[in-house]
Amino acid sequence: VKEEGGNILVEGGKLEGAGYESGCYVSPTIAEAENHFKIVQHETFAPILYIMKYKELDEAIAMQNDVPQGLSSAIMTMNMQEMEEFLSVNGSDCGIANVNIGTSGAEIGGAFGGEKETGGGRESGSDAWKVYMRRQTNTVNYGKSVPLAQGIKFDF
């Protein structure tokens, strides 16, 4: 991110101390980035949150849909029009689209599968014939807090 002109807002890293002795826990990196950055366009499978500026919802959806992957997406809004646009055929092109819930993996109980380069579950699984349909798991949270999977908390 830094090499392409972005800023690291929160430096991630290995968690240490009581409860983290195994060395298998990390804190996320939060970075200001632009959609054309090479790292943004690649599926890193790392705890990195990219913050990108936009003016209109259509611009944000276009940035999201411009990456080659399409597993999971999320929007945080209480605006019903924005929610409907994001969940519509004109919105997220991911296999999983969430409203007011992050892309934590808790949505795996739905009709799971990615799109574009993240489509292995649909193309090789028992639902392979359904790849010719556009399905999407939608989760909408009307609460005042954002639930995270497995009790995860981001206390910075």
Predicted regions and their residues:
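Basic phosphate/pyrophosphate-binding loop/patch that engages nucleotide-derived ligands
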Residues: 2-7
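Short, solvent-exposed loop/turn elements at beta->coil junctions and helix N-caps
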Residues: 12-19, 102
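Short beta-strand segments
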Residues: 9-12, 75-76
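Conserved C-terminal structural/oligomerization subdomain of aldehyde/semialdehyde dehydrogenase
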Residues: 21-156
